[in-house]
């Protein structure tokens, strides 16, 4: 998608001469369902505007349209109660999880998944913000207030759903990320000193040049994760899965790797680093 104007997303609609050219504010209005009297018309225009982001085969077009519709017409799902244990507001948790999951599902049908990004940040008062981007255009931002973990004293992200989010440069010192779902997350240049990631899933993640010293990574699945130039000093890694992880120049000083799954690693070389 080529953005002609930073104030406008204009994508030629498939099989039609209509080009809605929806503005940034109109898209936000659609997602928030402000004009409730014309929801269906708004959804149809949103779909016609965005459909060319997705592969043109019938399966992908049908699936993407339904996923977008599910995201647009939010309904509570009991399955979301297992996520974000530290969320202050349950309804906000459900909406947050729902839209992030649907965004990730949409990316699976995109012609260029890199054009669709979820960029996150964490404020000093423990507010998790995630903005959805198409290209360089921010189309929607959602926020979730989180509490303090009684076990670590840091932000409570236990059981969080953070898959696919870019949290580069985040300060997550002593964060509770136990049992979090973080597949394909990007945490490059982040500070996770003393964080608890026990039982987390981090397949295909990017954690380059980050500080994971003194973290609890026991039972964490980090298969295919890029840990290049990352500090893992004194991390606890009992039963940590590191299948095919990338660990160039990773500092593992003080780590007992005897119980870690090092499939795809040269364990002798790995133990000599740091």
Regions found by a protein language model. Give the residues of each.
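Non-Sec secretion/translocation targeting segments of pathogen effectors
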Residues: 1-30, 46, 50
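N-terminal capping/linker segments that flank leucine-rich repeat
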Residues: 7-13, 100-156, 266, 273-274
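Extended non-catalytic scaffold regions that mediate assembly and binding
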Residues: 37, 83-87, 119, 216, ...
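Type III/flagellar secretion export determinants
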Residues: 40-55, 171, 188-191
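Low-complexity, charge- and small-residue-enriched intrinsically disordered regions
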Residues: 44-90
């Amino acid at each position: 998608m080529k953005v002609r104007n930073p104030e406008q997303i204009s994508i030629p609609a498939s099989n039609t001469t209509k080009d809605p050219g929806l503005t940034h504010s109109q898209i936000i209005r659609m997602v928030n369902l402000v004009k409730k009297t014309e929801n269906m018309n708004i959804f149809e225009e949103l779909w016609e505007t965005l459909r060319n982001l997705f592969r043109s085969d019938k399966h992908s077009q049908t699936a993407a349209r339904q996923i977008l519709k599910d995201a647009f017409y939010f309904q509570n799902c009991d399955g979301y109660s297992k996520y974000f244990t530290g969320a202050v507001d349950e309804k906000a948790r459900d909406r947050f999880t729902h839209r992030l999951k649907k965004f990730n599902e949409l990316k699976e049908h995109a012609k260029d998944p890199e054009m669709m990004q979820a960029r996150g940040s964490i404020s000093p008062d423990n507010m998790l913000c995630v903005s959805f981007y198409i290209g360089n255009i921010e189309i929607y931002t959602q926020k979730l207030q989180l509490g303090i973990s009684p076990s670590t004293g840091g932000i409570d992200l236990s059981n969080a759903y953070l898959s696919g989010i870019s949290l580069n440069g985040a300060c997550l010192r002593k964060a509770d990320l136990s049992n979090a779902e973080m597949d394909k997350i990007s945490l490059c240049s982040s500070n996770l000193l003393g964080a608890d990631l026990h039982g987390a899933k981090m397949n295909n993640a990017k954690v380059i040049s980050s500080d994971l010293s003194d973290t609890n990574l026991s039972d964490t699945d980090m298969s295919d994760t890029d840990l290049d130039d990352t500090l893992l000093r004194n991390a606890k890694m009992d039963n940590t899965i590191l299948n095919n992880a990338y660990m160039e120049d990773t500092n593992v000083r003080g780590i007992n790797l005897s119980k870690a799954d090092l499939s795809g690693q040269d364990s002798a070389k790995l133990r000599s680093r740091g």
